[in-house]
Amino acid sequence: MRVSLRWLRELVAVDLDVTMLADRLTMAGFEVEDIEDRRTWAEGVVVGYILACEPHPNAQKLRVCQVDVGQGEPRTIVCGAPNAAAGLYVPVALPGAYLAKIDLKIRPAKLRGVKSEGMICSLAELGLTKESEGIHTFTDAVTVGEDVRPLLGLDDVILHLTSTANRADALSMVGIAREVAALTGAPLTLPTPRAIAPKKSGAKGPVQLAIADPQACPAYCGTLITHVQIAPSPLWLQQRLEAAGLRAINNVVDITNYILLKWGQPLHAFDWDRLQKVAAQTPVSVGVRFAKAGETLKTLDGQERRLSSENLLITAGDVPVALAGVMGGEETEVHPGTQNVFLEAALFASPVIRRSARAQGLRTEASARYERGVNPAELEAATAEAIALLKEIAQGTVSDTTLADQRPPLERTLTLRLEQVHRLLGAVVSEAEDSDEPAYLDPETVEELLSRLGFHLSRQETLEDELVVWSVTVPPYRFRDIEREVDLIEEIARLYGYDRFEETLPAQTEVGALPLELTLLREVRAAFRGAGLTELMHYSWVKGGQPNQVTVVNPLVAEFSSLRTDLITGLVQAFRYNHEQGNPPLNGFEIGRVFGQDEEGLWENDRLGGIIGGDPWQGKWVRRSQQPQPLTWYEAKGILESVFQRFGLNVEYQSDRHDERLHPGRTAVLCLQGERLGIFGQLHPQYAATLEIPAAIYVFELDLEVLLSRLEERYRQIVFQPFSTYPASDRDLAFFAPTALTVAELSRTIWKAAGGRDSFLESVELFDEYSGSGVPAGQRSLAFRLTYRASDRTLTEAEVNELHQRIRDSLVEKYAVTLRS
């Protein structure tokens, strides 16, 4: 917003230097982006009177003027303007003057042999317009030799000010004046509101108001003013508009723009006779409604606009005549022949105008204010001043005023606690240099600061030991942005000055961190991604018909009628879908919740499921003689085992046949420290064939709570131990064992025979399995590699042999295996 310092000083008697005022406003939250000092634009330019104007002897387009500038002898000035003539009062830049807007220093010079002692100026050369057809001439009474700056509005300073989105009241000169008065303590001089006596909507008269949606238009005031005389506005009004960046049009339109700048209340003037013609009825029904499909409106910018249901309209006889709160229509605009006007002053809902303007890609001074929120309390004051100016400047006569008013009450009372003020703002900078005690705002200062802003405070009854508590009444013009106690405290800090409070750090700070459970979940996800699995996510809702499911009574669709009881089903279906689409085999995992019910009631817990069906050869370079091979049980188990090893978990695998979806000979229950962790196995060939997917697909499902609890134990008690620098000794152990005997059972026996994890046995690894020719019936050939190592010395051959033989004897004794090596 462009704020004229000269206009501002008419409203508030502030005598601060403009730089200091700009600094105070900026510190109070109204950033001054630029200071436009117009006083420098025409320094050294005075009023001159052209006594004579003759053609230049050596140039056809130049004229030689004799100009009286009030300094004795007339000055000879060469001028090229086509409108230069004797008898005109003109602005003259004397030698030594500097025209800042065109960066020109005036010096005496010879032009085509004729001496020129100055320059007769156009408005463009003085910075008031971009282009000019000739020199500027004064039509009002002026005095030769006087400074032209007061005559042209160049004795002013313009502050380019930006307000925050919540301060809609600051988009007006009255709002800024109130703020400056509060910041500086200077007296505020606002015009006394004139009274208007509108009749209620529905009463007999030339205008009938029809508001279709009071939520979109809480108040609408229409005034019929007759016998107006359209003419140029007086100079002071034109200068006010020009300083604000608006173009003067005629006295009626200029008055509406002036009120918008002063009060922040948009107004619009319709040509009454044209409005009657459009309505084609008496009395004229002026309405406010949303647009209908297919309606159009030609706006003041000459564009034919196709309207949508988001556009709020002003209508005459239900015919659109204006985009409410945005722009008027061309058909009813005020023109040089206008004799009667209908003046609109209304309140429109901010969201409605925002959507309407966005839908049309149109933003105006009016819509900018409506989008922020117009002060509902001063509608009558703005209307009354506009009517008074129309009577004074346009010689109009008020014929009728109608008001449709459904504004909500604008009263708000808040409780303010001095204790809360001290807690949020802290101590103030003490004026006593030798004082070590922190100083805080006292009640009197708080009351003074808020009173300056127009708040009314009354102290409540408090006990002797308690701090002061106030009941604060919010002024109507701050009704939109002051809603809570903290808003009042912000106003106190803003007015007192943020730089006048002590710089204090919070008494206690705590470094932010993820909870341990989330940290472990992130590590689990990273581990499975590192093993080549992609994280998947499925709906918790599945098709019903399975036992123990929790079913919804009235599902939206049958496919999502029950809650899932496991993750494996969803993972297999995802594999099947990708297989049907021709995508590569799926390797993925999912962390999710499963649900069920039993005789004890409903239950739910978190699980981690996965599917491993990736072909290790697909998409790879292979030898021509080599065919892609499906994943083996041990390869799939190795992927899962790599994750467990990453976390240092010793998981045992025990044969299991309970899940009919899984291969009975290739399914294992996973146990961790004697507690069931989950299940791992290959899909049953018949189940895979039913789904028309490959048989070499492996799935697992883990109890997430068990997994995280074990990880949490290790996380809280991390044990570091050095690597052994001594050599290891490997021994291979091969034997025939019954097929029903699991590798997990054999591994446990080997470790137990060696003396546990603290023995010289470092690792046990199965590296070969064979069943077929040469192997006794009902048995298989297994080969283990055992690694022995000590942490403090090199083991002797005798020590290794003794321990290795103990393990061999234990296997023979317990399982009657047939040793092969």
Curated annotation (Swiss-Prot):
Its cofactor is Mg(2+). GO terms for molecular function: ATP binding; magnesium ion binding; phenylalanine-tRNA ligase activity; tRNA binding. It comes from the Bacteria. Residues 39-149 form the tRNA-binding domain. Residues 409-503 form the B5 domain. InterPro entries: aa-tRNA-synth_II/BPL/LPL, B3/B4_tRNA-bd, DNA-bd_dom_put_sf, Fdx_antiC-bd, Fdx_antiC-bd_sf, NA-bd_OB-fold, Phe-tRNA-ligase_IIc_bsu, Phe-tRNA-ligase_IIc_bsu_bact. Its main location: cytoplasm. Its EC number is 6.1.1.20. Mg(2+) binds at D481, D487, E490, E491. One of its GO terms (biological process) is phenylalanyl-tRNA aminoacylation. Coiled coil: none annotated. Residues 724-820 form the FDX-ACB domain. It catalyses: tRNA(Phe) + L-phenylalanine + ATP = L-phenylalanyl-tRNA(Phe) + AMP + diphosphate + H(+). Keywords: Aminoacyl-tRNA synthetase, ATP-binding, Cytoplasm, Ligase, Magnesium, Metal-binding, Nucleotide-binding, Protein biosynthesis, RNA-binding, tRNA-binding. It is an enzyme of class 6 (ligase). NCBIfam families: pheT_bact, YtpR. This is Phenylalanine--tRNA ligase beta subunit. The gene is pheT.
